Structures are given as C-alpha cells and as structure tokens.
C-alpha cells in the first residue's frame, strides 16, 4: 500500500542529489511532487512545457530560486494542497578562512537561511489553515563538528538549524511537524570540485530519501532533529 497516496509535496533543490532522490521516493509512495530548482526550467530541463500540477505518484518540474520571494509564493500556490515541504536547496564553496569570499558567503546565506525562511514562511501560512503538515529541512552534520575549509558553509547551516528550531515551536500549536535531517557525507554534486575524498564511503542520496519517507509517514510522532552519517563517520 502506498503510504502517501492523496498528498502533495514541494521539494526545493529537486534537480539533483538529495532533493531529487527525495522527490522520487515521495512519488513512489503515491505523493504528487513538485520538484523545484534554479537549475530547472518550467516543465522540464528545456523549458518546453508549462508547470503542471503533478498527478499523484508523479513528479513535475519547475524553476525556483528560493531566495526570490515572489517566485516562492507563486510556486507554493500552484499545488491544490500542501502536505509536505522538503527544503533541500543548497550551495557550497569551500576553502580556508584566509581565502574566504564574502560574495560566496552571502550566496550561501541567501540559499540556506533566506531561502529556507521564505519557503518555511509560505509553507506555514498554507498549512496553518488546515492545521496539519510537515516541513523537512536538509541540514548538515557540520553544525555539530568543526571541519576545516567549511567556515562559510557551517555558518549558513547553523543559521538554517536555528531557524528550524524556532519554526518547530511556532508550528507545534497547529499540528505541523518540523524536522531537521543533519546529513553527514553524502555522494552528491557538491563534492565534484573536492577531489581527495573517498565517495564510495559516503551515503547515497537514496539512503536519506528512504529515511525521510519513514518519518513523514508516521504522523503519530515528531522527529525534530536527527544526525544521519555514513558508517565510516566523518570522512
């Protein structure tokens, strides 16, 4: 039996990596999924079709820059109902602090903090009306452990986690759950420019997507923060 039949989800960062895996996993359980990314064009990678409300069990594609308030409002209004939002949009550049770029830091804050805030706000506004829903934020284990060359990324992810904690308290009276999945090393395109790491020891995006499905289909409990790491630990 498909556990999410009759529900609608919006996934940011849905063109690749964890976001794309989550979109596929949710659709496999019967959800209608609108997968969004600033790398996508409306209706598909070539922009040759309008945004289509997804049928149950299907994924529709749409462009979305999560830091663009007007576009976020538009996208959130395109689903007939909104049961689940997965904030998986992310960007990361890495290097020692002595070489840190303020422009790159600002971009990461725009995506991970501003973008998450805007998406969470629009999700909460809609979910409050029905007094139910679930917002999942794909965070990072860097909030718990210091890694060299990750200062700007860590700052952005810590901001996102702080936002999620406050959101969880504000959403609770409306029966809306908020979850932060603090992911360890996962084999996604964020590692493409970082040679020297053994990606065979990393988790696959599908592993996190499977875990996400296991918690969003359990309305009798609220998983608010959880660290998910590969068996090898920090890589």
Regions found by a protein language model. Give the residues of each.
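Active-site helix of classical SDR
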Residues: 120, 156
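Substrate-binding pocket helix/loop in short-chain dehydrogenase/reductase
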Residues: 96-97, 104-106
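Conserved glycine-rich Rossmann-like NAD(P)H-binding loop of the short-chain dehydrogenase/reductase
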Residues: 29-46
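C-terminal helical subdomain
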Residues: 173-176, 180, 197-235
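Active-site-adjacent segment of SDR/Rossmann-fold oxidoreductases
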Residues: 145, 166-176
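Residue(s) in the substrate-gating loop at a strand-loop-helix junction
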Residues: 140
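Conserved glycine-rich cofactor-binding loop
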Residues: 15-16
């Amino acid at each position: 039996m498909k556990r999410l039949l009759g529900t609608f989800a919006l996934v940011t960062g849905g063109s690749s990596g964890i976001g794309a895996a989550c979109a596929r996993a949710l659709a496999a359980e019967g959800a209608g999924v609108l997968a969004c990314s600033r790398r996508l064009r409306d209706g598909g990678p070539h922009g040759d079709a309008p945004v289509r409300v997804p049928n149950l069990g299907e994924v529709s594609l749409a462009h979305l820059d999560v830091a663009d308030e007007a576009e976020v409002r538009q996208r959130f209004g395109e689903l007939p109902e909104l049961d689940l939002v997965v904030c998986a949009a992310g960007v990361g550049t890495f290097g020692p602090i002595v070489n840190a770029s303020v422009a790159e830091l600002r971009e990461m804050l725009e995506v991970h903090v501003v973008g998450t805030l805007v998406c969470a706000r629009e999700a909460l506004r809609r979910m409050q009306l029905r007094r139910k829903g679930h917002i999942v934020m794909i965070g990072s284990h860097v909030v718990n452990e210091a890694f060299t060359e990750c200062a700007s990324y860590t700052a952005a992810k810590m901001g996102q986690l702080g936002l999620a904690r406050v959101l969880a308290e504000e959403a609770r009276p409306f029966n809306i759950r908020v979850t932060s999945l603090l992911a360890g090393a996962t084999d996604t395109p964020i590692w493409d420019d970082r040679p020297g790491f053994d990606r065979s020891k990393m988790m696959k995006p599908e592993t996190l997507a499977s875990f996400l499905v296991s918690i969003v289909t359990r309305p009798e409990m609220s998983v608010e923060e959880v660290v998910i790491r590969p068996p090898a630990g920090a890589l």
